[in-house]
Amino acid sequence: MSAEGLRFTLKVEGIQEMSTAVVSFSLHQKYSIPFTLEVDIASGLFDLTAEDFLEKNAVLTVWQGDTPQRYVSGFVSEVSLGVNNGWQMRYQLSIRPPLWRAGLRQNFRIFQQQDIRTISATLLNEAGVAEWMPLFYEAHPAREFCVQYGESDLGFLTRLWAEEGLFFFERCGKAGPEQKLAVCDDVAGLTSAGTLGFNPDTTGGGTTEHISDFRYRAEVRPSSVDTQDYTFK
């Protein structure tokens, strides 16, 4: 994507879109971890409070000229006040997907004779994730029993998904800000990115998507996993 004509807008529910301007943003996104979008905005509205931002839906749009290139949708989970220079107020926002809310609650409960799709649907619905995409290519039989013991709903879900060989990500719409949580058990559920070229020039850029920076990293990780079942009555 060329830097020429590139601009960014942020729409926050309940706040007039033209009253804010995106100063900078950073998006941290990985498989099987809820993303975090940090946005620094400037506004001529000096009297905005935390209640005007928190829990409100927000959409960051990346534009190339007058054409939207990408949307990132979520809700505002954190807000802090920045500098007031007399004519603009700065606000720093943290935006996360609805799944992130599942990490705010801990619970003790037992699920019996339910498969991973049913258990996931229950917890996701409780977290406010109304729509999600179970992209399952393999059978996932019902479990005799499954215990959530003092874990957060998010910790419990991610543990179960890891045990079932599942990973998750946010699938963004290309034609609009529609965005859904996708839970997948095979790379066949991923959209191919095609071939990406390498272009270290971030000032001029090119007309297509490319990699501008990469790093090599190595670390020690577990090489095997042992599991053990216990009798439940």
Short names for language-model regions:
Residues M1-K233:
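Amphipathic alpha-helical and helix-coil boundary elements used as assembly
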